[in-house]
Amino acid sequence: MLTVDHNISQSTIHGLGVFSNEKIAAGQLVWTFSPVVDREVPIEQLLKMPDHVLRMFARHAWYVKERGTFVIGLDGDYFMNHSDEPNLTDDGEHMYAARDIEVGEELTCDYSTVTVVEFDPNKGHAH
């Protein structure tokens, strides 16, 4: 669940992106798991789903290897784009602002640390 006010808009990085509607201070919590807003799905359940659902999870969800689950949010966080110099850091359970973030700035993370399965480092986004 994104803990900051945000909107989904056109991104110069790729497709749509998540943009902050408020100033965010360096170190501020920006994302945390919420069982109300986020869904954690065991891979065994996903493998029973149609291919288009598997593709959606591979492209937009975070894979949690230690638990064998995928996490996908319902608040638009799945539109968050990759950056080699992200403004969010990730400790595996939470995301924090890596630096001060201005109103209107796109929120970005490093897909290689949040484990987006279809991330292509050569393209800089999931495909």
Regions found by a protein language model. Name each.
Residues M1-H127:
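Conserved catalytic SET/PR domain of SAM-dependent protein methyltransferases, capturing the structural core
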